[in-house]
Every structure is written in structure tokens, then in C-alpha cells.
Amino acid sequence: MAPGESAQAAGLALGRRITEVFRQPFVLDTQHVVVSLSMGLVCYPEQADDPAMLLRHADTAMYAAKRAGRNQLCLFDRSLELAVQDSLRLDGALRQALSGQEFSLVYQPILLAEAGALIKVEALIRWHSPSLGWVSPDRFIPVAEESGLIVPLGRWVLQEACRQLAQWRQENPQSSGLRMSVNVAAWQLADADFVTDVQEALAANALLPETLELELTERTLIAEDPTIEQNLSTLRQQGVKVALDDFGTGFSSLSYLSRIPLDTLKMDRSFIAELESSRRCRDLVQHIIAMGRSLGLQLVAEGVETAEQAETLTRFGCHLLQGYHFSRPLPPAELAERYFQSRLPG
């Protein structure tokens, strides 16, 4: 509470100071810990004049801060109520969807730059709700992360992707060298059972660890959670591959290369989009590829939409290409029909 004539300004200033304090790591049982802080601010009496309404509006603003990426301060606005109501509807529908088999996976091919052969696929989740219709992942994934549903949802994606890979291999001898790439969220990686979840998904489908690649974003690594790093290290030692997605968009991209055990760098699609129009972007992409190759990492360019982009990336030495120039994400049967007629690398 910040009383006074300029309560809003005082509240914002105080909130920013508190947020900055919590951005700093602190020591807990000899471990450096970083916590995220989400704050909601509401002004009395302009926005509410009774305690119950003040708390409700502050709570609404706090959840808006969480949706903005955590470590945020948000001032209440009437429009936020609609967003919160939408999130609550989505949360309820998500819980029902998990038990109602409303989710499915599609798979986008990732190809060798020089030979054009299919090397691996990226599993992408889709949701068709009976009441909401098709819901974009950009809309429901943040809600799943806020509610904690991302852990069981991510577990289902992992299990289904491994099951599908095993089925392809059983039905199509040409797919024997195919690998599966699965996106994982920070909440999953920090879960105590995550390593077991991966091991069980592989064992249940008789898959070797090296057939699975886990994709994580730079945002996942910002908190420097020791559990995340330990889980990744354990799985990589067992043979599971690790890829850093959207490389180059974070503030500390280079630090991750020395801290996190990685096999693959996926360059952010924003670089690829400007490849032909920006000399600076071309130089940056060329340097990222050269750096990755010197570190023994596999380079993937996603968001490739033109033949010119593909040719430039191949000339620069990028190993793998992914994007609509080659294929949209496909249902399992369509992908098998299109790609398993030619031999995959073994």
C-alpha cells in the first residue's frame, strides 16, 4: 500500500524497486537461487473502493504480469478483466481436454541442407476444443504454464511423440534413421520426475536415447535453475540430444553455450526472414553458423520460406533446414506417405 496524492506513481516506483531486488540471486543452503516476482497494482479509490474489490483487481493485475513473462509489474486496467476471464475459460477447457483426448500432434520435417534427406521431425501440438474450436498454441501454452498444466501436457506430448516415432519405424523400414525433436518448457525441466518421464517414454517404445532431441528456449534458461541444468546433464549423458531453440534472441546467448550441454543450435526465424534483405543479418547468420560449427554443434535454420534462403544457408554451411519452403507441419500418415518413399540416413 502506498498512500498519498500520487499513489499510482508511488506504487509503481515502489513496485519497480521491489522487482529489481528480486531479480538478484540469493543464497539458500549454499545454492544460488533466483525467483520470479509478479506484482499487480490497483489504485484506491479510482479503481475500487472496498477491500474485496481491491484484492480482486490486484489479483487480476498480478496474473496479467505473469502472462507478460513474470518479473513484471502491471497496473490494473478494466480490459484486464476480460483477459483474465478468457484465461479462466481456457484453463477449464484445458483441464477437460487433457482427459478428453482433444490434443493431437503434427510433425514438421527437418532436412539435410545439401542432400534434402529427412533427418528428424519436430513434434508440434494442436488442440481442437468442442466448445472453442481450434485454439492456437500461442494462446493456450501460456495458460498451461501459469496453471501448472504444462507438466502433464508436456508429458503427454513426449509419450505420444515417442509412440509415433516407434510406429513409423515399425511400419516403414525407410524411417530407421529418423529422430524426434520435442519442445519442453521450463516447468517440465524443473520437475523432479522429468528424467524418469523421458526414460519411461523411451523404454515403453523401445527407442534409444539418441533418437530423441529436447528443444528448449533461451527463456527457459534465464532463471539458471540448478535442477534444470542437472536434468539436462543427466539426460545428455544417457544419450538424449539437447537443442537450443530461437538462438540469438536472448540477452545472454553466448553464456548458454558454455553452461548448458548442447548438441544443436536452432537459429531464430527472425534472422532467416531478413536474410535476403539485410547485409547485417546475412553477416550475423554466417558468423553464428561458423561459431556453431567450430564448437561441434549442429546448426538448424527454421522458418525457411524461399529457395533463395535455402541456397544461402546451405552455402554458409548450415547443416539442417526447416520451414514452409519444404513442408508445413504434417499429420503422421501424410508425412509417412510423402517422405518414407526414399531412404533416410541410417
Per-region residue spans from a language model:
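Active-site loop/short helix in cyclic nucleotide turnover domains
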Residues: 1-5, 144, 253, 275
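Regular, well-ordered alpha-helical segments
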Residues: 20, 24, 60-63, 67, ...
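Residues at or immediately flanking beta-strands
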Residues: 25, 32-40, 72, 102-104, ...
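Bacterial c-di-GMP phosphodiesterase EAL domain
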Residues: 20, 78-82, 89-207, 219-220, ...
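Cyclic-dinucleotide signaling modules
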Residues: 1-88, 92
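Heptad-repeat coiled-coil signal-transmission/dimerization helices
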Residues: 11, 15, 55, 195-198, ...
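EAL-family c-di-GMP phosphodiesterase catalytic domain
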Residues: 31, 113, 117, 130, ...
